[in-house]
Amino acid sequence: MAWVVLSLVFTLWPMLDLSVSAWFYRAAGRPGWHGFAADQFAAVAVIHEAVPWFGRSASLLGLLLAVFWRLRPGPVNLRWWRRSLMLSLLMVLGTGVVVNAILKENWGRPRPVDVQTFGGAGTFEPALHPSNQCDSNCSFVSGHAATGFTLLAVGLLGAPATRRRWLLWGLAAGLATGALRIAQGGHFLSDVLFSGLVIWLCGAALRAGYLYLRARRHRRLRLPQSEEG
């Protein structure tokens, strides 16, 4: 449903992307600074460089913690094992593979800074129109925002209240990071919103896969008892 809504919005009103990005842009020749607003602040550049490293560190840390909780002496802390495992898997498969390796490398959408409206040479492409104007690391979807959205993974296998809480944390982190990228001219609004949807769908798939494997394992463990009875 969310995919349909976003698709309709950005298909019917594709210029919404340009309008939002224009809030953060000042053309050359006007008084004061020109370009995208966030580029005027060194702290934003630091955050931009730090987010990918945070994602890589989180995926590695999640994997190490998942192994630790399994191998340490004593009973397994299943809650933290599941949280660590889901965080690592969603960061690698969702952000790393689906977002960065598949979509960003093949969709070809130019970034705001690359289109004529904002001083570039390219032509604006609506979100759901694959293009050939970008060869690699393209605009659709936002990898930085995806890293923030991936925080929802921590609650994927928890109780409903836990899932909602971590979903809110993931939304907050993803939207905040995405807003900075829009203000830098690195992404359009649709890149950020579709990034969140892609990560949510990947998370839902991981949750469904885990629950399916757990249910199948439980059935196998009960099978000998049912045959004996």
Whereabouts are the PLM-identified features?
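Structural signal for the C-terminal ends of transmembrane alpha-helices
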Residues: 12-13, 64-76, 155-162, 205-210
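N-terminal transmembrane-helix/juxtamembrane module of multi-pass inner/ER membrane proteins
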Residues: 1-63, 104-111, 123
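Membrane-interface interhelical connector segments
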Residues: 106-133
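Alpha-helical transmembrane segments of integral membrane proteins
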Residues: 19, 49-57, 83-86, 164-172, ...
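Interfacial segments of alpha-helical transmembrane regions
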Residues: 65-106, 167
